Amino acid sequence: MSTTGNIAITGIPTTAGPDGSFPLRRELRDLQRNYPDHFNLLVLALKDFQALNESVQTSYYQIAGIHGLPYKPWNNVGSNSDWQSTSGFGGYCTHSSILFLTWHRPYLALFEQALYNSIQKIANQFPQGPLRTKYVEAAKTFRMPYFDWASQPPSGSSAFPSAFTAPSLQVVDVDGKTKSTANPIYRFVFHPVNPSPGDFPRQWSRFPTTVRYPNPRTGQSQDNRVAPILANELASLRTNVSLLLLSYTNFDAFSFNRWDPNMTPGEFGSLEDVHNEIHDRTGGGGHMSSLDVSSFDPLFWFHHTNVDRLWAIWQDLNPDNFLTPRPAPYSTFNSTEGESQTKDTPLTPFWDKSATKFWTSEEIKDTTTTFGYAYPETQEWKYRTGSEYQTSIRQAVTTLYGTNVFANFAAANVQARATEHTELIKSLSLAAPPPSAPITAEKPLLITQEMKASPIPEHLQHLAPNNKYPEWVVNIRAQKHGLHGAFRVIVFLGPIDESDPDSWQTEFNTVGRVSVLGRSTQGPTTTKCAKCITDAADELMISGTVPLTSALLQDIVNENTASIACSQRKWCRI
């Protein structure tokens, strides 16, 4: 294949500091509050990046389009005959596959390096003198921020950062004056929606901008609905993330959600499963809800940067565990269905630094510094030994996501009583009429957790003899494309108003859900994703988990033990 014009994916070119350090990707709220110069550059540069002509290969539109629609080859990477869908080019999809995490890392690096071009451009447009010097210096250490949706928001902050919901922001513009500007983190404005006729079907071409929870009558984005839903599921998210990072030791189980009949009961959850729930809960039927178009919403990039961060944390805790070779369940540009999919499988369409071959999973797994960045938790250069480094990571994880459910619960109740608000945060869902599909609710899983920190309140000690307690979760598996679109499996502990699905978003007895990002494979909304069409024909099954222990503890403390009875356990799919 000719390499003429191949775009090398380098990330932001960086050399390590004298102490081995690399610039950090920081949490968005931390960046906005504590690194205002970096945040100012982010807003101005992202706006500049989004304004690039949509025909430019490194434009926001073209890079977002790699993920799904408009399903066109990118960076001189076409497809072989085995990979063509009936409607043409079949895309680069790696969802529900062993390459899910590794494929998205160079994808993020590409986005970051394209954004960084605008960062440098903007920094050098400030008037010469101290102002330009300040922003040029800030640009050197700018890295793409992440949105940590599983940690407790800073005091006074929303579960959904205001940067995602404010139509405009105050910035110091390149003329040195403070002014209001349209917020590029809030939404992406297509210019136009269909730069080439047919890029988007009517389902999406009717939206001139990305939307979240679109009003069914007007199509207007209802971003105000996201924060309460994220807040109500925070306890469940924290538990899931803590379990994944500290209890999962097998990369295949940790990384992706394809169900395997050889799975153990403790392997039904995955980072992809949690990732899907954020797409679902923030999208609400808008762009983030559909993998065909989710990457056009600016939120996608902050969300996936956090997914990459969680993988980096897990990988450094489990450095000797990586993907297991397995037959490719579908055909891609570089492999045919049935061929072995390994750590050396090319991650198309991402050319490496030489621009002559593609990145592989093996080349990018060990360290994020390959692409010039690190995370606050992965500053390995600060520690003398690997053991000290891993200890610091575990401490960071327990600080952010809790040491154990009992400790989290006790802390939440202390805070709740102080504010005269006794409801624990619980996960909710977007309501819709429940269709039918083959879905299996597995028996609740009992995992024994040993608590290594935070004493148990005396009135709960009988529930954790010998400082151990059962971690209850519901294991769920479902046919991914069985409903020809996205759906959720919701778990309740206790009665609900089954006649009013809209109320499920605020039901106290709603515990959590597994979000299934299926795609339509029939009718006018049929996806062009070749892998998805193959997966649907093969009746691909995926799995996920819903933690129960926090909800059970809440009922015990409230002396509402009826919810524990089998007759009160409910689940529903919508």
Swiss-Prot record:
InterPro entries: Di-copper_centre_dom_sf, Monophenol_mOase_fun, Tyrosinase/Hemocyanin, Tyrosinase_C, Tyrosinase_Cu-bd
Protein name (record): Tyrosinase
UniProt GO molecular function: metal ion binding; tyrosinase activity
The reaction(s) this protein catalyses: 2 L-dopa + O2 = 2 L-dopaquinone + 2 H2O; L-tyrosine + O2 = L-dopaquinone + H2O
Family: Belongs to the tyrosinase family.
Cofactor remark from the record: Binds 2 copper ions per subunit.
Keyword vocabulary terms for this entry: Copper, Melanin biosynthesis, Metal-binding, Monooxygenase, Oxidoreductase, Thioether bond
Principal EC category: oxidoreductase
GO BP annotations, alphabetical order: melanin biosynthetic process
Gene that specifies this protein: TYR
Cross-link (2'-(S-cysteinyl)-histidine (Cys-His)): 93-95
Cysteines joined through disulfide linkages: none
Role this protein plays: This is a copper-containing oxidase that functions in the formation of pigments such as melanins and other polyphenolic compounds.
UniProt KW Metal-binding keyword: yes
Binding site for Cu cation A: 67, 95, 104
A Pfam family assignment: Tyrosinase
Keyword Calcium: no
